[in-house]
Amino acid sequence: MKKQIIERLTRYVKIDTQSNPDSKTTPSTNKQWDLLNLLEEELQSLGLKTDMDEHGYLFATLESNINYNVPTVGFLAHVDTSPDFNASHVNPQIIEAYNGQPIKLGESQRILDPDVFPELNKVVGHTLMVTDGTSLLGADDKAGVVEIMEGIKYLIDHPDIKHGTIRVGFTPDEEIGRGPHQFDVSRFNADFAYTMDGSQLGELQFESFNAAEVTVTCHGVNVHPGSAKNAMVNAISLGQQFNSLLPSHEVPERTEGYEGFYHLMNFTGNVEKATLQYIIRDHDKEQFELRKKRMMEIRDDINVHYNHFPIKVDVHDQYFNMAEKIEPLKHIIDIPKRVFEALDIVPNTEPIRGGTDGSQLSFMGLPTPNIFTGCGNFHGPFEYASIDVMEKAVHVVVGIAQEVANSHQSYK
């Protein structure tokens, strides 16, 4: 199976599917259609019924081969790649039996070094796919696409493996936070689903951040600096003051585990106007709300000293902790745990310090935990994929389908 995984992943990563946060269309880039159309053809060649809408949401159905009712399970992956780094002319390199030493990435002068990326020590002896140092790899999330495709093909090639109805979904624009925005849960028509969009072997994630984006706009008063005393209000200084009043230790670079943070993503402006772009993250809903409240309080504390109330704060909730929707449905986690155990994989249920499409889908009525793909260092030239772990992920897809069928009961 490793050969087929390498061939399929190579085929997919060479297609540039980078999304664009500045676009107003869905998909945000036309080039995502290139992979979506290919996947539709490949699914149809496997005998699956497909359905792709005008927004690039490709759904397919593998019909049940049993004569009793079990839940319909879905498997999801996104086709777009991150806008954070070059995604064109991807030239994947294969490292056989990785020896644990630094890997020179093509002619780029970049080195994939286990001293810098210690998770590489977990894949010694594996076959790896890496970049040539000039682009990201796109294993996030084309590895997930491969694992679903290979899992479906395996089930078709082994009709003795019993399974219920399986729904497949390949979606656009996850990397820019819009993956579920046009996702039609009723059209997908699954009882629950799994995103194949994790990283290290064993990841089984059903806790995510609560997330919001915050725009702080500071309005100044521009006066000639030679006569500015008691008249000028410098918007840049207001922005600096605002940021200084947030807890300095509650930032991404000083937090881990369940610790939340404020993250200043961008700060631009001049004397007349300055804009600060933040994201807020916290696993705890109460603390999440307190973080938003704290930013409003800082605004008020500064504005009280000025006649024109110079600071505005706009908050937009992005997604919420999917544990709220998944934990009451214990079987959705128990199923992959049993599959992991059968494959000698130790489950790692640590919370995601981020979000997946499943974070939003779970609140849209489709509970969707996240499962490992075997890849790491996403969104940059040091991205890699372990073909060995990807093979295990394929067997997880197969195992979940089999486990649902073998349970002989409906979890609806």
UniProtKB/Swiss-Prot annotation:
GO terms for cellular component: cytosol. Binds 2 Zn(2+) ions per subunit. Disulfide bonds: none annotated. Its cofactor is Zn(2+). Belongs to the peptidase M20B family. HAMAP family: Aminopeptidase_M20. NCBIfam families: peptidase-T, PRK05469.1, PRK13381.1. This is Peptidase T. The gene is pepT.
